[in-house]
């Protein structure tokens, strides 16, 4: 009888592991490129805008990094998005932000990078509007 329950338990754990690892959409993303991009931009703007002495700054940066990684994981390999200017501009912005976070994790974002990111976020929003209309 013990052997039977051990096999049932092993089967249950295997199936649950298989089902959770097959999920296509990372937590917090809808799978809709436009909605996810706008949500990520909003989250990144909030994290960037917080002053350095804000106690919530570290948590906001960690959340932004997680969303950034989830976004990359979901959309980077989607070939249908490579022709969209919104995707390419967003990828450029995220690469520059990820590069800063990996090279200088304890330093604040330079004003020049903040301005560049804001400009690219606006370009992405305009491109998303254009792409939605066409």
UniProtKB/Swiss-Prot annotation:
One of its GO terms (biological process) is photosystem II assembly. Keywords: Lipoprotein, Membrane, Palmitate, Signal, Thylakoid. Its main location: membrane. Pfam families: PSII_Pbs27. It comes from the Bacteria. Residues 1-21 form the signal peptide. One of its GO terms (cellular component) is plasma membrane-derived thylakoid membrane. It is a lipid-anchor. It is found in: Cellular thylakoid membrane. InterPro entries: PSII_Psb27, PSII_Psb27_cyano_bac, PSII_Psb27_sf. A lipid is attached at residue 22 (N-palmitoyl cysteine). Gene3D superfamilies: Photosystem II Pbs27 (1.20.58.810). A lipid is attached at residue 22 (S-diacylglycerol cysteine). NCBIfam families: PS_II_psb27. PANTHER family: PHOTOSYSTEM II REPAIR PROTEIN PSB27-H1, CHLOROPLASTIC (PTHR34041:SF1). Belongs to the Psb27 family. Plays a role in the repair and/or biogenesis of the calcium-manganese-oxide cluster on the lumenal face of the thylakoid membrane. Its presence in a photosystem II (PSII) preparation prevents binding of other extrinsic subunits PsbO, PsbU and PsbV, and thus assembly of calcium-manganese-oxide cluster. Psb27-containing complexes lack oxygen evolving activity and an oxidizable calcium-manganese-oxide cluster, but have a normal reaction center. Part of a photosystem II (PSII) assembly intermediate complex PSII-I; crystallized from a strain deleted of psbJ, it forms monomeric PSII before addition of the oxygen evolving complex. PSII-I includes 3 assembly factors not found in mature PSII (Psb27, Psb28 and Psb34). Binds to the lumenal side of PSII, adjacent to the CP43 (psbC) subunit. This is Photosystem II assembly factor lipoprotein Psb27.
